[in-house]
Every structure is written in structure tokens, then in C-alpha cells.
């Protein structure tokens, strides 16, 4: 059944396509004739043909091929369906084929027949020709009163030659025949009984089939003689009552059976809906729980990997700074001990030569020793400040690389205290916005998620004009769904190309390139992406300042050691 329905639909679609192509071919000559007429008119007016249609070509309206095709297909399909329903009402053989291969045909035919039956336009077929009347009429042999005596042998011969239904009716009707035939023989004069017998009456709400049968019996009573007609009328009334009772009983049984079938189908449909809904809800819940578990596991793994990497980098930085400071301290201490030993040796030598003569030299040496101790303390202090600066810069970098926005104010203050009077570091720290110091900045992952959420809205507004109204927005919403989504690194300034390049840049971790691509948008997409652009610019500015501070921090230790 499904295969036959699909074949019928394919045949109807091919017919509609062929009809549309024929209509287009028929419309082409008309178009050519119109163009020729216009060219002739332009030639008659002294203007070249191209000048005549130059403005018209610019104002050429859309052909709406898709809309015309849909309308034509709808009208052709509706006409074919209506014609099939009409012919099915006229031909039973075509009706069986039409109901079998066309969906919803049976419901339409049943509805039309029910409406015709209710309005009284659908009637039971009755014999319309003499041949049909002869075929549907039961022949009854002559009996009852007649103008001559009937021989018993002739009556028997005629009764035997009749068919079985006619013979049964003849037996019931011809039972009073002897008394009726005796009277004309005894009287000896032919008489005709012209007494009319009343016809069988029915109520107006009787079944049409019963009405047709009663009408046939009434015609038979009107034709039959009066004596037999009275008996036939009484029996027919009994038969009609029984027939009407049987028809009413059959109708009630059919209605009850139909009602039971409908209730059974409704209960089965309700059970099927309930079971299907429970199965679908259980599957959706299971799939949702599985996705949540996978996301939680992936998030935990990513956090663990990031924290491990951050801990290793911090430990490496601490060890590097500590080793560098220890090396400086040991070198200064060794130099001081060496100088102190040298001074002691010189002093001992001087004392040997004479204490009083060398007091001036001893004072000079002590002064130099004090200067050396002061320089050593300054070097140790600078080394401590350098280590503190490197540690504060590492904490700021770690906060920027975290998975959640963190207020940068404490890290900025720690770097400011460790930087001292360095003008470049102070300028870089002053350039950090107050919002970032109090609320922090969004992470690259958060910016990527926000861009994914913003991307459909940008695509919907990609076709909105600059000063568009409600119609422009609705048109952009509808036609933007027909655009193809680009991938890779396409060229061009259209919204799809810009979104594709921005997605690639975000996937590669190049936030600066993604912000630059989104910054090239214009119109409504630029307005919708303004908040995301502000967050992205703030993030890139903070990263740039953090890089400047880190590079200056590397040079800070070398400059301090030289001083």
C-alpha cells in the first residue's frame, strides 16, 4: 500500500512538472510577440530598441518562479483530486482503485456520500425502463374475479411455468381463486370489480430501501385485481413492517459495532501514544544524563591538566628566581670576604710597618669597606625586589589564564609595590582599566562560547538594511536561513566569510585576529556584536599589558644588578 501511494505521488508530481513546462513553453511565444511589438513601436517613434527597454530592464519585476510553481502544483493536485472524487462517485470500479492508491480519498468520498444522503440528493436506484421493471417485477398468474371461467388445467399449467419466487407468491394470492371463479359461472354474466384497494403507507423517516420496496408492492397492488389485491395488501403490510423492523435492527447493530470499533481504536491509539511518549522521554533523559556526565568528566580533566601545568610553571619560576638570588648573594659574600681578607692582610702588613704612619690609609680602607657593605645590601635588596616582582607577574599571568574571571586589583598592587619607581611598569599598571581590576576579564573560552551564541543572531541580521523596519528584519530572518554556512578561511567582506574566519581564529587561540575580523562588520551585525567586541578588546589589551609587564620584569633584574 505504501509503495503504491509513493508511486502514485511520483506520477502526479511528474504530471505537474510536465504541465508547468508546457505552460512555460506556451508563454515564451507570447513574450516574443510582446517584445517584437515593443521594438516595432520604438522603431516607429524614431528611437532605438535598446533605448525603449533600458528603463524597463532596470525596473523588471521578479518572476516568482518558485511561488508560481507551488501554486500551480497545488491547483493541479487539487483539481486532479476533485476530479478523481467526482468520477469515483459515478464509477464503482474506479472508486475502488482511487481509494486504494490515493491517500485520504476514502474519507472524502464517505463524507460526500453522507452529505448527499442527509440532504436527500442520494437516492436508491429504482428501475427506470420497462425492461428494468419487467426484471424486478414478480409475475403473478391470473386469479380471482375474471370475465370468464378459468380451467383448472390452464391455471396449473401457468403456475408450473412460473419461476420459484413467482410461484410462491401465486400460491399465496391464488388461494381464494375457486370461490371467485365459481361466482361468474353460477351467475352466468361477466362482471368486473372496480373497487380500489388502499396502498400501503409508511412514515416519512422510513429507510429509502424500504420505501422503494413498498412502492413496488403498491404498483403491484394497483395492477392486481381487487380481491387478490386486498389479501396482497395485508400481507405486504406485514412484510413491510417486518422489513422495516429488520432494517432498523441492522442499523442499530451496525451503529453499535461502529461505535465499539471506534472506542477500541481510540483506546489502542491512547495506549500507543502513552507508550511512545514514555519511551521517547526515557531515551531523551538517558541521553541528556550521558552528555552531562561526559561534560563533567571532560571539564574535570581539563581543570586538572591546567592546574598541574600552572603548578609546574610556578615552581620552576620560584626555583629560578631563588637560585639566581642565591648566586648573587653568594658571589657578593665571597667578594666581600675576599676584600675583607685582603684588607686584613694589608692592615696586618701596615701594622707591621707602623700603626701610626698608616692610620690614614686604614681610615680610607674602612670607608671603602663600608661602601662595599652598602652596595652588597643594595644588591641583596634589589634581588629580593626582583624575585617579588617576578612572583607577582607570574600570579597575574596565572590569573589571566584561569578558567574563571578574577579581579586583577590585588595582583596589580603587588606588582606596583615590587616595581618601585620603574616608569614603564608604573605606566603599564596605570593603563589597566578599573573594571578589569575590580571584576576581571572574560577568559578565551568564555569569549568563544559567547561568540557561538551570538553567531546565529549575526547571521539572522546579516541581510538587514541600515534603516530597515519590521519588514526588513522579518525578511532577513527568513532569507538568512537559506544562506550556506561557510567554513575554513574564505575571502570576502560578507558576514558569512567574517564569521568563518573569526571561528577559525578562536579555535586556534588567536583572540586578537578574531576581534579584528569581527571589527570589520557593518550595520546591524556590528551593533549586535558591539558588547562582544568590547569584552574582546579589553581581553586583548590586558594580555598586551601583561606581556609588556613580563618583558620589563625580565629586564628589571638586570638593570637593578648593574645599578
UniProtKB/Swiss-Prot annotation:
It is a single-pass membrane protein. The chain crosses the membrane at residues 69-89. GO terms for biological process: cristae formation. InterPro entries: MIC60. The keyword Zinc does not apply. It is found in: Mitochondrion inner membrane. Residues 18-68 are mitochondrial matrix. The keyword Transmembrane applies. Disulfide bonds: none annotated. One of its GO terms (cellular component) is MICOS complex. Keywords: Coiled coil, Membrane, Mitochondrion, Mitochondrion inner membrane, Transit peptide, Transmembrane, Transmembrane helix. Residues 1-17 form a transit peptide. Residues 90-563 are mitochondrial intermembrane. Residues 23-59, 128-170, 178-197 are annotated as: Disordered. Residues 239-379 form a coiled coil. Residues 38-51, 149-170, 178-190 have a biased composition (Low complexity). It comes from the Eukaryota. Component of the MICOS complex, a large protein complex of the mitochondrial inner membrane that plays crucial roles in the maintenance of crista junctions, inner membrane architecture, and formation of contact sites to the outer membrane. Plays a role in keeping cristae membranes connected to the inner boundary membrane. Also promotes protein import via the mitochondrial intermembrane space assembly (MIA) pathway. PANTHER family: MICOS COMPLEX SUBUNIT MIC60, MITOFILIN. Belongs to the MICOS complex subunit Mic60 family. Component of the mitochondrial contact site and cristae organizing system (MICOS) complex. This is MICOS complex subunit MIC60. It comes from Yarrowia lipolytica (strain CLIB 122 / E 150).
Amino acid at each position: 500500500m505504501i509503495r503504491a501511494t509513493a508511486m502514485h505521488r511520483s506520477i502526479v508530481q511528474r504530471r505537474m512538472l510536465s504541465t508547468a513546462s508546457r505552460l512555460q513553453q506556451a508563454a515564451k511565444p507570447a513574450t516574443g510577440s510582446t517584445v517584437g511589438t515593443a521594438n516595432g513601436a520604438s522603431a516607429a517613434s524614431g528611437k532605438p530598441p535598446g533605448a525603449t527597454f533600458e528603463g524597463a530592464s532596470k525596473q523588471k519585476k521578479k518572476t516568482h518562479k518558485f511561488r508560481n510553481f507551488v501554486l500551480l502544483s497545488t491547483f493541479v493536485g487539487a483539481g486532479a483530486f476533485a476530479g478523481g472524487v467526482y468520477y469515483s462517485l459515478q464509477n464503482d470500479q474506479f472508486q475502488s482503485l482511487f481509494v486504494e492508491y490515493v491517500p485520504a480519498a476514502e474519507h472524502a468520498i464517505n463524507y460526500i456520500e453522507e452529505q448527499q444522503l442527509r440532504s436527500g440528493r442520494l437516492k436508491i436506484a429504482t428501475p427506470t425502463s420497462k425492461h428494468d421493471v419487467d426484471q424486478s417485477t414478480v409475475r403473478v398468474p391470473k386469479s380471482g374475479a375474471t370475465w370468464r371461467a378459468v380451467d383448472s388445467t390452464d391455471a396449473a399449467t401457468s403456475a408450473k411455468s412460473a419461476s420459484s419466487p413467482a410461484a410462491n407468491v401465486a400460491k399465496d394470492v391464488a388461494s381464494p381463486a375457486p370461490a371467485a371463479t365459481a361466482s361468474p359461472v353460477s351467475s352466468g354474466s361477466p362482471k368486473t370489480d372496480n373497487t380500489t384497494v388502499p396502498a400501503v403507507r409508511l412514515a416519512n423517516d422510513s429507510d429509502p430501501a424500504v420505501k422503494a420496496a413498498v412502492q413496488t408492492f403498491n404498483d403491484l397492488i394497483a395492477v392486481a385485481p381487487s380481491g387478490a389485491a386486498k389479501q396482497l395488501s395485508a400481507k405486504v403490510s406485514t412484510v413491510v413492517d417486518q422489513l422495516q423492523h429488520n432494517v432498523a435492527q441492522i442499523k442499530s447493530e451496525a451503529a453499535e459495532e461502529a461505535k465499539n470499533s471506534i472506542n477500541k481504536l481510540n483506546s489502542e491509539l491512547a495506549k500507543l501514544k502513552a507508550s511512545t511518549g514514555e519511551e521517547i522521554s526515557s531515551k531523551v533523559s538517558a541521553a541528556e544524563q550521558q552528555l552531562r556526565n561526559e561534560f563533567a568528566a571532560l571539564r574535570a580533566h581539563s581543570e586538572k591538566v591546567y592546574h598541574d601545568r600552572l603548578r609546574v610553571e610556578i615552581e620552576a619560576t620560584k626555583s629560578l628566581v631563588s637560585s639566581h638570588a642565591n648566586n648573587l648573594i653568594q658571589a657578593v659574600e665571597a667578594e666581600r670576604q675576599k676584600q675583607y681578607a685582603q684588607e686584613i692582610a694589608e692592615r696586618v702588613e701596615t701594622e707591621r710597618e707602623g700603626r701610626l704612619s698608616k692610620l690614614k690609609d686604614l681610615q680610607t680602607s674602612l670607608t671603602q669597606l663600608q661602601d662595599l657593605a652598602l652596595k652588597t645590601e643594595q644588591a641583596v635588596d634589589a634581588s629580593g625586589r626582583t624575585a617579588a616582582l617576578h612572583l607577582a607577574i607570574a600570579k597575574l599571568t596565572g590569573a589571566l589564564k584561569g578558567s574563571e574571571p578574577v579581579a586583577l586589583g590585588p595582583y596589580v598592587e603587588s606588582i606596583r609595590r615590587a616595581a618601585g619607581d620603574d616608569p614603564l611598569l608604573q605606566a603599564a599598571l596605570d593603563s589597566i582599566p578599573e573594571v578589569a581590576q575590580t571584576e576581571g576579564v572574560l577568559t578565551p573560552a568564555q569569549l568563544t562560547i559567547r561568540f557561538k551564541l551570538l553567531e546565529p543572531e549575526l547571521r539572522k541580521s546579516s541581510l538587514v538594511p541600515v534603516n530597515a523596519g519590521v519588514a526588513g528584519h522579518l525578511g532577513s530572518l527568513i532569507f538568512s536561513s537559506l544562506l550556506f554556512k561557510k567554513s575554513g578561511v574564505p575571502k570576502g567582506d560578507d558576514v558569512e566569510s567574517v564569521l568563518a574566519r573569526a571561528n577559525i581564529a578562536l579555535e586556534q587561540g588567536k583572540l586578537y585576529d578574531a576581534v579584528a575580523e569581527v571589527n570589520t562588520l557593518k550595520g546591524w551585525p556590528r551593533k549586535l556584536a558591539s558588547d562582544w567586541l568590547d569584552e574582546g578588546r579589553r581581553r586583548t589589551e590586558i594580555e598586551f599589558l601583561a606581556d609588556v609587564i613580563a618583558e620589563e620584569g625580565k629586564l628589571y633584574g638586570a638593570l637593578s644588578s648593574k645599578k
